[in-house]
Amino acid sequence: MTNPTSHFTCLVCKSDKLTKMTGYESAHLCKCGNCGFVFCQEIPSIKELEDHYDGYGRNDYLSPITIKRYNELLDEFEKYRSTNKILDVGCGIGYFLDEAKKRGWEVYGTEYTDEAVKICSDKGFNINKGKLDPGNYDPEAFDIVTSFEVLEHINNPIEEVGNFNSILRKGGLVYLTTPNFNSLLRYRLKAEYNVIGYPEHLSYYTPKTIKLLFNSSGFKKKKIKTTGYSKTRLKTSQGQSDQAYISESSDDEQMRHRIEKNKLLQFAKGSINFGLSLFGVGDSLKIWFEKN
């Protein structure tokens, strides 16, 4: 029996009311007429995925500002500490888990590449290779599950979020980030927006559709934010620059450092992000959901 090559129902609500999105044919995007979820209708083959990710470079740059943001998140997570276990799904080489471990958390992670798994294992982390498998953990073992920029890469979101539910204790928290399909940049650039691309990104979320996904999987919303407007993304999407999105010299990173040193710029950033979140049009979708 051959594997299917296309989805015929919505990945979130299972409706068959799917419409191909004009202008996004190269990414095979369709939109659900029932819930509005946008996703890649084409199912990439194993070979397509291997060919893509074999050439997927690893970027080891870690901004000191990112470390600061990680610790601000961990400050928020303190009130959830009960089992003292935290899992980062798609943990890379463990930068977030480094900070969690320093604060006394028992840290766990999942990652696909042998290299990243070895690096994390050498740090003493509890790492499993491959996709999240709840069979690798005790039921309701974790206080916190995090996942930074991972959900857009998968085409089985109901299964993934259901797995979050099974390994989190009651009242435990999921914190997750993913690109926002309703961002100002996507509206401006449309299919030129380089966040959109097959077979790397297969699912595209908005505040509405990610809330639907988590609410239907046994979670309740604590917070949803959409923040940021990336000058780096704008320039690279338009072919005006080839700078790495995450790098010390990128326009975005230089701006982050200027903002950190200037109280007025910090106030301006906060005000802009408030407006972007209010209207749901920031680049990054950040969610906090508790297990019912």
Language-model-detected regions and their locations in the chain:
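A SAM-dependent methyltransferase catalytic signature shared across enzymes that methylate proteins
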Residues: L11-L18, K208-T226, L265
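Conserved catalytic loop of SAM-dependent methyltransferase domains
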Residues: K222-R256
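Helix-to-beta-strand junctions that scaffold the AdoMet/dcAdoMet cofactor pocket
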Residues: I154-N155, L168-K170
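Short N-terminal helix/helix-N-cap motif within the alpha/beta-hydrolase-1
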Residues: N155-E159, R186
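Short, glycine-/aromatic-enriched active-site segment of Class I SAM-dependent methyltransferases
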Residues: V174-S203, K208-N215, Y229
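Short catalytic micro-motifs in class I SAM-dependent methyltransferases
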Residues: F148-N155, T177, E200
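Short glycine/proline- and charge-enriched loop/turn segments
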Residues: D54-Y61, L189-Y198, S237-S249
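Conserved N-terminal segment of class I S-adenosyl-L-methionine
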Residues: M1-F148, I158-N163, T226-T227, S250-N262, ...
